[in-house]
């Protein structure tokens, strides 16, 4: 059962009001557009001809576009079936929404920040000698995402978000120079209050503290003046992509990253946001399963740069120079663990699907097993093919999904993928105790990932995300062991699921799947 409080209900109501008035304003704009079309009825023939020509041009462009068919096919169907509506929606939504100025800002910031990271070509060469099975993935990340691979980094794995929070609070309280925190959602309640108390103490001790959060992700959790409250406490605070009452399809691109950096020495990432439900303070969907990792050592540099990218690109005017030297200071650290660590970030503003490509590469490289855990399973044909092909090669491919959903319509789409995967040998497990929000993968006791990237369209194509690729290190075995515990708590989906669905449900799920990439 969901646990409600007056404070939580009030914040939800405030968020609903903001969403309502924004949606109302957008609806009025849409009504106005329809009204204008009806007033132009005398030019109907010319409008239909123009729209039809434009529809053909767009369909040809989509057909030749370098993008997965799972993303282009729904648009082609919509444009051909309903030309006026399809063309209008595509021009508003399908062009990936981000204004040219926004893309230019990110490109400018990246051109200043990413070259500050070391190339570490010698480490990559060492990786090819020690773990060639994983080295190709690291090469891909270094060349295409521009995030290098590191050694000399200790990794601690937390199989529960609450354990990660306690460690995080301890490290935050020891910060000497700076604290960077970037999260999709912050809830102004007990869990955040504990963090806020530590941050305020650190500010008073002279530590620079920055907090960056996504407006849509936090809209039902905090008041609108939250950032102002933080500024009054001395905490520098910025909001990513505020919800506005106007057509702006960049609103579809959210900051889903979850990063904490402390003094450039320690970093945290994982699946959890800074809200009570992630730490099982409340139980809206049964037991909440989330995970995280702590990095200490050289690899922290990449998460520092990833944070500064979003922080600086969110400014309307990018500074001519971004001095990061004070945040990338060298310090002597000798890691106790060995292995290869590679933090990385993904952006919807380029043509590189980094998160999906890493997952596909792991499935392709796996020889014995490749396991995933995700809260949502809404994948492209390419991802589906990689998983089923691995299973056909004899690889033990498994995916864990939630037993209790947080979004029932999305859960219905998730379940619609079960049959096509199961019948080709992929094993699907439903974690019965509650909602698994963790986003991880592990293969062959050699490589693993932990981060924010779900196996769904929004994470793989629409959101700003981050992850950490790890190879030949102790944490890979810890993640594997956690998967084994989760399998023991889960129910396996069999082919009987296919016969257990009514024709009406199958039809509904098929339609939702077809247009899932447009959501």
Listing of model-derived features with the role each one plays in the protein:
Residues 373-374, 401, 431, 450-451:
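Thr-Gly-centered strand-to-loop micro-motif
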Residues 184, 375-376, 410:
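Glycine- and other small-residue-rich loops at beta-strand/loop junctions that grip anionic moieties
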Residues 1-357, 361, 405, 419-423, ...:
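N-terminal localization/anchoring segments of enzymes in phospholipid and broader phosphate metabolism
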Residues 439:
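Catalytic-core elements of nucleic-acid end-processing and repair enzymes
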Residues 427:
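Surface segments flanking catalytic/ligand-binding clefts of nucleic-acid enzymes
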Residues 333-338, 346, 353-375, 381-392, ...:
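Acidic, glycine-rich loop-and-beta core segments that form the ion-binding/anion-interacting portion
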Residues 382-385, 389-391, 396-423:
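Extended hydrophobic/aromatic segments used for targeting, binding, or gating
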């Amino acid at each position: 059962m969901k646990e409600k409080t007056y404070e939580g209900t009030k914040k939800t109501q405030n968020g609903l009001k903001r969403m309502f008035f924004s949606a109302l304003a957008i609806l009025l704009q849409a009504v106005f557009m329809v009204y204008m079309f009806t007033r132009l009825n005398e030019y109907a023939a010319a409008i239909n001809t123009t729209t039809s020509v434009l529809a053909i041009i767009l369909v040809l462009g989509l057909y030749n576009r370098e993008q997965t068919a799972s993303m282009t096919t729904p648009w082609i169907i919509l444009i051909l079936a309903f030309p006026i509506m399809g063309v209008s929606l595509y021009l508003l939504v399908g062009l990936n929404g981000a204004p040219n100025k926004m893309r230019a800002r990110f490109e400018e910031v990246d051109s200043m920040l990413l070259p500050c990271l070391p190339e570490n070509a010698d480490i990559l060469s060492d990786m090819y000698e020690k773990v060639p099975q994983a080295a190709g993935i690291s090469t891909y990340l270094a060349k295409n995402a521009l995030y290098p691979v590191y050694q000399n980094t200790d990794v601690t794995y937390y199989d529960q978000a609450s354990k990660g929070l306690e460690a995080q609070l301890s490290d935050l309280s020891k910060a000497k120079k700076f604290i960077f925190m970037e999260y999709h959602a912050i809830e102004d309640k007990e869990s955040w209050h504990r963090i806020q108390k530590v941050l305020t103490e650190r500010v008073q001790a002279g530590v620079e503290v920055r907090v960056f959060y996504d407006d849509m992700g936090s809209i039902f959790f905090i008041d609108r003046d939250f950032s102002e409250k933080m500024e009054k406490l001395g905490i520098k605070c910025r909001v990513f992509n505020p919800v506005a009452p106007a057509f702006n399809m960049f609103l579809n691109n959210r900051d889903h990253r979850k990063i904490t950096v402390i003094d450039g020495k320690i970093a945290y990432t994982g699946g959890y946001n800074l809200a009570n439900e992630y730490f099982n303070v409340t139980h809206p969907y049964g037991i909440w399963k989330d995970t995280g990792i702590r990095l200490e050592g050289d690899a922290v540099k990449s998460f520092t740069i990833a944070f500064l990218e979003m922080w600086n690109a969110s400014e309307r005017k990018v500074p001519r120079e971004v001095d990061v030297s004070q945040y990338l200071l060298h310090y002597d650290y000798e890691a106790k663990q060995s292995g290869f660590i590679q933090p990385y970030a993904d952006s919807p503003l380029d043509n590189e699907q980094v998160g999906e490509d890493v997952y596909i590469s792991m499935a392709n490289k796996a020889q014995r097993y490749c396991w995933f855990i995700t809260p949502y399973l809404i994948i492209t044909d390419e991802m589906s093919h990689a998983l089923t092909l691995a299973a056909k090669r004899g690889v033990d491919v498994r995916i864990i999904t939630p037993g209790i959903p947080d979004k029932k319509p999305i859960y219905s789409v998730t379940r619609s993928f079960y049959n096509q995967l199961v019948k080709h040998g992929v094993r699907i497990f439903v974690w019965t105790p509650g909602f698994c929000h963790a986003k991880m993968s592990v293969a062959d006791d050699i490589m693993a990932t932990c981060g924010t990237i779900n196996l769904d369209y929004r994470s793989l194509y629409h959101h700003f995300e981050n992850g950490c690729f790890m190879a030949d290190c102790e944490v890979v075995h810890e993640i594997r062991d956690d998967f084994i515990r989760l399998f023991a708590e889960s129910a396996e989906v069999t082919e009987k699921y296919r016969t257990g669905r009514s024709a009406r449900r199958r039809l509904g799920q098929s339609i939702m799947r077809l247009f899932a990439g447009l959501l």
